[in-house]
Every structure is written in structure tokens, then in C-alpha cells.
Amino acid sequence: MSFCLTELHLWSLKSTLHIADRDIGVYQYYDKKDPSVSATEHGNLEEKQRLAESRDYPWTLKNRRPEKLRDSLKELEELMQSSPCVLSKWKSKYICQLLFGSGVLVSLSLSGPQLEKVVIDRSLVGKLISDTISDALLTDSFIILSFLAQNKLCFIQFTKKMDSLDGNKRLEKLSALDLKISYYDIPGPANRTIDRHLAVNSTQDLVVCWWPLVSDDVWPWTPVSSEKDRANMLLLGFTQGGLEVLSFVRTEWSPLDVHFGTKQPYQVFTVECSVSVDKEPMADSCIYESVRNKLHCVSVTRIPLRSKAISCCRNSTEDKLIVGCEDSSVILYEAHRGVTLLAQAELRPSLISCHPSGAILLVGSNQGELQIFDIALSPINIQLLAEDYSPKETLQFKKFFDVSSSLVQMQWMAPPVVFQKPKRGEICDLLFLRFNKGPLGVLLFKLGILTRGQLGLVDLILQYIHYSEVYEAISILRSMDWDTLGQQCLIGMGTIVNHLLRQRLTPEREAQLEASLGTFYAPTRPLLDTTILEYREPVSKYARRLFHHLLRYKRFEKAFLLAVDIGARDLFMDIHYLALDMGELALAEVARRRAHDIDVESVSSGVELLGPLDRRDMLNEGFASSALMPEGENKFPGLLPSIGSTHMQTLQQKIPNGPSSRWAIERRTEEEEEEEEEEEEELCTDSSGATTWNAEGELKEDQRKQDIGDVGSLRMVHFGLV
């Protein structure tokens, strides 16, 4: 079974951590003042120290000038005890910046999972109107601060540019940048302590300031409050070296998250906690657009939930929204397919973080627990490096603390996509962890050399196939979009199909093959014409291999339907000759006639057909519903519909047909079609091994997912073709 192997590195010198000698996957720093280690008193601690030093993990921190790393870390741990951390930002893969409520800015320089340098900057201490900072924005040219109790924003400009040389490693204090500090009033409820959050767009010319709706919406002193005072989302711009409120709106529901789009810098994405007409909890995914410096809501997608949302996260491409709920359920909404997935977590999902590659997502609780799901919400086991193999569903951090400390933040160590494009082949295997009042640390994912340290969608499919977890691999493939990830989809499909074609054909594997090819031939939403033209030839090679695989096991009905979808003359002739050898004369005649029709069509049109002729040219509904085993013996009632019920597209003339559209070259006369359908129906009636698929045409649902169709309108997606 596939699982993630990890190491936990805690950046702490405290003796309150409870790390056993045999915990070779958990590390902390030790002080030189500690008494000498004795093998008889401390068991295997000496061996663990030798193991750490052999891997270039420091056992004790150096205190050389000017860094004085050990003293700086002790000062940082004391600071975390006295002041809350309001912001942590990864300036690059090597530098993390922490801003505390008192105005202290701490920069951490890393080398792998280990601390290399700690710089504590107190340039802002005593220069602000308040030491209760709510949120902050840190860029290379300015800082913006919001406060808990004041309706003001602090705008700090750098009149001197930051040195760009070796920007990934260089740490510079704010005092060297000649700060210019100014304050600006903003609308909103006065005399109230509110968490005012900030976000900036990729072009760094717009800022949004937002806060949750106040529950006790009472406005004293004025009979009618102005719309400006009731607003909870502000759009700000930069004018003449300062900040200006450009627009303000009051959201319909209380927002859970607000940020600018990564690809559309003038769109604002929000997630709002709403309620349906039946008083059922929902999440509204809204898009606001800035038009002439005014915010307008242009899109609202309502997602039904099982309980109130408490956390949310979007993937890097922003086509998937993950919502964590109070009842430990995790909801994933896929925008490109318009479907919703549900999984039940083993913990309360207070924190959610999606890997930059979009392959996995991590769910954490304040109690110090961590669980991993793939992007199709299949759970993945996790284990710390140890002598024994013991992967589990969750990872427990709390057992390493003598004093209880809640997990308040987890973040992948990578710069935001809006500020820096990830380099090709760059490894992202470190998860930053911050516990309340300390310590800080990272969780290192040991991804191995076979994937070259990568954790992408294709890498995850390869891992699933390595452990023969085909359903999980197919669900990953189904979640991928051919229009944007075509090459990765092709590689993933090839991996799954090649694995299945090497094995004996069974009803289950046949359904899995259909599901894999169906991601291209029968997508939930039609693919772009350019996508079909680019990938139909390599995908058809896999379809041809499946066709001959079906013939090898004498699955004539399915092979015929697949040949109809592919629309190639040689496939029908293969059926014709094999059917003659097997004594299936009726099938041989139908296949020969279909091959002849394709010849006629090719001559008349001057091109070789690459797809089916027409929906009415296919076998009738009774023939298309033929199954694998005699009635009463179907042990796979939740398998997929046959490939013959899917649609291929030849991109020449679009003919609407029910919910999907098919492509044809020319229509045949109704008399010819009726005559052939009668023969095919007679052939289907004579087939002794034909039964029907289940009415839903769905692949058996993973037992770890729960069907909530009875409790709401949430749509469940099963593995297989829809």
C-alpha cells in the first residue's frame, strides 16, 4: 500500500520536547550545556547523534559571530511566548519571514530542513500606533499593516531599494531601507476588535482588506448606518505614493477566505459561509471583478455541505476548492468538471494546505494531527522514518510535547505562485509547521530517487500503479483536465492502460480500462477541438491495444462497440475473420458490412474516417448494454458502462445528440439504418453471454467515501465514467 515517509525537524532548544532515542525520524537541537550523554543512562542517544551528524543534521547549534545562531534561536523562542505571530511568508524557498504582533520581524534562512541563520529585526518596534497588528503584507517595496482595534492601515514605503544580489540568501534589516510610515483611515465598524485581513494581487497595484461579518450587527448613535460603514471588503489602490479606498462592498455572507486570482490579477476569489433555503449549510465560491476600480460580483457557485465550513484552500491552478467542515468531512469541488467529492477525515480539519503541484492536500487539526489525501480525496497513509514499517492514517505531533501545544499553521515551503514562477524540476518537499507559542519546525517528505524528489500528479499515479492501487490511479486521472494537462494525462493514461493490459482480462480490469480511456473519449465536459486533434492519435493506439485484448479473450460484443468508436476498417475486418473462425457468421457479416461502409465513406469524402459514423449507426441500446457474465452471476454490479456508449469526435461536423454531441461525415438513409439495426438486434438476441450493466453505469465506490445523497444535494462522483 502506498504511503508517505517523512521526517520531523523541530527548531527548538527546549527540554520540554519529548523525543525518544529510538525516534530516528524526529530531530531537535541540543544545548552544549547539557550533561554528557551516557549510553547506559540514555539508551541509544549516542547512536542517534551519530546518525544525525552523518546526514549533516547539526546536533548542537554554533554560536559564532556575527550570526550567533544558538542565541538567536533562544531569543526567537522567547518572542513566540510573549507575542503572537500574525504572518509567515516564504520570500523564497530558502527564506521565511515572520512578523509578530509587536512589530518584530524575524527572517529565517534555511539549508534543507535545518536552520542556517536567524535575523531578528526590531526596526518597527515603538514606531507604530498600536502593538496589536492583525495582518500584514510584505513585499520588496512596501509593507501594509492592519490592526485589531483601529480602523486604520499602516503603509510603510521603502525609499531605498533592497539589494537584489543573492536575494535567495541575503537577509537585510528594514532600518537599512529608509522607511516612510503613513496611516490611512478605512471604513468599517468602529470601537470593535476585528481580525482585518489583507491580500495583494500579483501586479502589486491593488490590495483588498476584509473581515468577517459582525454577528451582532447593532449600529448605535446613528438611525441608519451608511453602506460604507457596513462594508466588510475594501478595494484599495496606490495613488501619489499613498493608499486610497477605491471600492467597498458588503458580502452577502460572512467570508472565510479572500484572495486575488493568480492568473487574473483583477479578480477577487472569496469563499463565504452561507445557508440554503432549507437552512442547510453551504459554501459560496464567489468571483468579484474590479472594473473601473469598482468591485462587482460576477459569479457565485453554491456548494452544499454536511456542516458549517471552518477552513478552505484552493489548488495552485484555482480550479479546485477544498472545504473542511465541523463534522470532520472534507469537500472538494472541481470547477472544470462541475462535480463535488466527499471524504471523511479522521480529525477536525482546522487547517488545509494543498501541495504546489496539486497532487496531494494535507488536513491538520489544532490538536496536532495530520492526514494526507490525494486530489481525488483518497486517503494516503503517512509514517515518520523508523526502524519498523508502520504507516497510519494520521500523524500525531502532540506526543512529542510534554506541554500541550496546538498546531496553528502549516504551509508548503515555496514562494507564492503570484510572485515567483516555480522552476522546472524544483523540489517542494518541506512543510512548514508552527505551533502556538512555539516551536517552529518542518516536516520533510522523503520522496525517493525514482521520482527525483517530485510529487506531481503523474508521480502519484506511478506510485499507485506500483502498489496495484488502480482505482486510486484512475480517480487521479479523472480529476485531471485534458485541456490544460494533456501531456500529463496521456502519460498517466498510458501507465494505467499498460499495467492492465499486461494482466489477464477480468470484469473489474475491463471496467478499469474503459474508465481510463473514457477520460478522453467520454469526458464529463467536451474537450477543446485542439486537444482532441493533438491527442486522438496517441490515445487511439491504446484503444486499439484494448480492442485486440478484448478479441484475445473473445469479448466480441465489447470489441465491436470499441471498433465503432474508433471507426477503423481494419478493426472490423479483424472481427470478421475471427468471427468466421469461431462460427459467429452473423457477427462476421455485420463486421464485414461495417468495414465496407467505411470504405465507401472514405472514397466519397476523400479522407479516412477517424471516428464513428453516427449515433444511429451504432448498435441498438440492447446490444450496447451487453455485459460480461450471464445474468445472476455479475459480481461487479458497480462497474462502468461499455465503451460503445461513449462518444468519439472526428471534428468535422457537430451533430447534437442528447446530452453529448457527436461528429459525423454524412447521414445514411433511414431505410439502410433500420435494416442494419434489425440484423444487429437479431445478432444481439442470439448472443448467449449477454446481460446488462447496472443502471447507473458507475464504478464501485471506494468504501472510504460516504454517499450523502440522502442528506443533501451534494453530488457524489464514483470511480468510472459518468
UniProtKB/Swiss-Prot annotation:
Effect of a null allele: Y-shaped metacarpals and defects in palate and tongue morphology characteristic for a PFD syndrome phenotype.
Gene Ontology biological process: auditory receptor cell morphogenesis; camera-type eye development; cilium assembly; cilium organization; circulatory system development; digestive system development; embryonic digit morphogenesis; embryonic organ development
Residues in WD repeats: 305-343, 344-383
Principal place of residence: membrane
GO cellular component: axonemal basal plate; axoneme; cilium; plasma membrane
Pfam families: Frtz
GO molecular function, one term: phosphatidylinositol binding
Origin superkingdom: Eukaryota
Keyword Iron-sulfur set for record: no
Ranges of compositional bias, category Basic and acidic residues: 697-708
Listed Acidic residues bias regions: 671-684
Annotated transmembrane regions: none
Biological role: Probable effector of the planar cell polarity signaling pathway which regulates the septin cytoskeleton in both ciliogenesis and collective cell movements. Together with FUZ and WDPCP proposed to function as core component of the CPLANE (ciliogenesis and planar polarity effectors) complex involved in the recruitment of peripheral IFT-A proteins to basal bodies. Binds phosphatidylinositol 3-phosphate with highest affinity, followed by phosphatidylinositol 4-phosphate and phosphatidylinositol 5-phosphate.
Family assignment from sequence similarity: Belongs to the WD repeat fritz family.
The protein's assembly and partners: Component of the CPLANE (ciliogenesis and planar polarity effectors) complex, composed of INTU, FUZ and WDPCP. Interacts with CPLANE1.
Protein name: WD repeat-containing and planar cell polarity effector protein fritz homolog
Gene name per UniProt: Wdpcp
